[in-house]
Amino acid sequence: LLLRLIVLSLISSILLAACSEQAGERRTYVLTTGTTGGTFYPVGVALSTLVSAQEDAGFSLTAISSAGSMENIKLMRDNQAQFALILGIFGAWAFDGSGPIRNPYEDFRSISAMWPNVEHFVLRSDLVTDGTIADLSNLAGERYSIGMRNSGAEQTGFYIFDALGIDYSNELSIAYMGY
């Protein structure tokens, strides 16, 4: 039911944009997703397949892979994509021009919330002392994979480290790896 509502919301939003196109033309829009190993990519491919199957809609949607939320906002700002899957916090940062996003993107709009996001920090057992978020301070001097450059994982990870007072740029050896 949730997927059906999301698809209907997406189709309705795109229909409004497609109404200005000449009759008989099938316009193609780009939906930027995330890495092929993450969750955004298969969800984006499924959405584009469902939308594109609606032949009477007058448009189609092509899903492309990317580094994730941060790159997706840049691709939309540069008009290389018309739709994007992003983490909710990135939507707020993009609209306000806050966090890692320098300039407000005031024409940025949300169509639908997809699912709540949960951050996972995986540590070796020898770095876990009490099983709480305080264990992240045990990472000092360690190599830590934060995700891909320009990804949501990278930026939200840095945001959380900052909030916890962890100086990741000096205390950790950051590695940029995908899922």
Predicted regions and their residues:
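Bilobed "Venus flytrap"/periplasmic-binding protein-like clamshell domains
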Residues: 26-54, 59-62, 117-179
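A structural signal for short loop-to-beta-strand junctions that line the ligand-binding cleft
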Residues: 102-119
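A short small-residue
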Residues: 24-28, 97-98
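Bacterial signal peptide processing site
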Residues: 20-22
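C-terminal motif of bacterial Sec signal peptides marking the signal peptidase cleavage site
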Residues: 15-18
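Pocket-flanking alpha-helical
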Residues: 48-49, 62-104
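Bacterial N-terminal signal peptides that target proteins for export
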Residues: 1-6
